[in-house]
Swiss-Prot record:
Designated name of the protein: Small ribosomal subunit protein uS2
A single GO cellular-component term on record: cytosolic small ribosomal subunit
UniProt gene name: rpsB
NCBIfam families: rpsB_bact
Family: Belongs to the universal ribosomal protein uS2 family.
Pfam families given in the database record: Ribosomal_S2
PROSITE patterns: RIBOSOMAL_S2_1, RIBOSOMAL_S2_2
Region feature Disordered, mapped onto this chain: 223-271
Biased composition regions of type Acidic residues, renumbered to the chain: 253-271
Organism: Wolinella succinogenes (strain ATCC 29543 / DSM 1740 / CCUG 13145 / JCM 31913 / LMG 7466 / NCTC 11488 / FDC 602W) (Vibrio succinogenes)
Keywords of the record: Ribonucleoprotein, Ribosomal protein
GO biological process annotation, one example: translation
Length: 271
């Protein structure tokens, strides 16, 4: 379990500039250094250990914890630790309705399965060069958005979120469904929207790695207590019908201009 030394070495105590704070975080702040809010690590340690136990107990009860973190410094770490414990994750972009309209998300996952079946059977090689290209592009896009949730059978029981302010849509959807949210809270966050807050730096890579590592270990420990080491089990994929294949192909061909449009959206977001 996390120690004070871990927190200090990973810079968990460094908050944002004082002008970028949320006054609701005042009780978690130790002081100010060079116009930077310093988080009270005594409180961080207490909240961290409590939340670790909450997540461990949830995993012991067979509950599913989804990892969410889409910003650059969190994306790879979220995937890395979620993959080690076979947990669902979102690390590229949160699609609206990912929780509240999960049935639609499942339909998109089905399209990914259909394309993969066409590849495995060699049927994709019988298509024109353009059709094959467009299907491949669609597969890559679906994998990017949904690869981390493709084996989920239902909405998760808990969310672990890195940067609750950035992932406000995910947090709002979870709250609407009564799904508890666990999150490190930087000094610019609103603690009222998180069920199990851990005051701490949610921007530094080492800090993010520490949070993800501890949550993954809590889940592993919980599963071990329950005598289960497995996460989301892969289910047998239903063979695709010819109608499904034609529908996915037609949709892929109609998205010819989407690749350019998406790159423009990403560029705009990064400005």
């Amino acid at each position: 379990m996390v120690t004070m030394k871990d927190l200090l070495e990973c810079g968990v105590h460094f908050g944002h500039q004082t002008r970028r704070w949320n006054p609701k975080m005042k009780k978690y702040i130790f002081g100010v250094r060079k116009n930077i809010h310093i988080i009270d690590l005594q409180k961080t340690l207490r909240y961290f250990r409590y939340t670790y136990n909450v997540v461990r107990d949830a995993a012991a009860e067979g509950k599913t914890v989804m990892f969410v973190g889409t910003k650059k410094q969190a994306s790879e770490t979220i995937k890395q630790y979620a993959d080690t414990i076979n947990a669902p994750y979102v690390n590229y972009r949160w699609l609206g309705g990912m929780l509240t309209n999960f049935s639609t998300i499942k339909k998109s996952i089905r399209k990914l399965e259909v394309i993969e079946e066409m590849e495995a059977s060699g049927q994709i090689e019988l298509l024109t060069k353009k059709e094959k290209l467009m299907l491949t592009r669609k597969k890559e896009k679906l994998e990017k958005y949904l690869g981390g949730v493709r084996h989920m059978k239902k909405a998760p029981d808990m969310l672990f979120v890195v940067d609750a302010a950035k992932e406000k849509i995910a947090v709002a959807e979870a709250r609407r469904l009564g799904i508890p949210v666990v999150a490190p809270l930087d000094t610019n966050c609103d603690p009222d929207v998180v069920d199990f807050p851990i005051p701490g730096n949610d921007d530094a890579i080492r800090s993010i790695q520490l949070f993800c590592k501890e949550m993954a270990e809590a889940i592993q420990e919980g599963r071990a207590l329950a005598g289960s080491e497995e996460g989301e089990a892969t289910e047998e994929v239903t063979p695709a019908s010819e109608a499904e294949k034609q529908e996915v192909l037609a949709e892929a061909m109609s998205e010819e201009g989407d690749a350019l449009q998406e790159s423009e959206v990403v560029e705009e977001e990064e400005k």
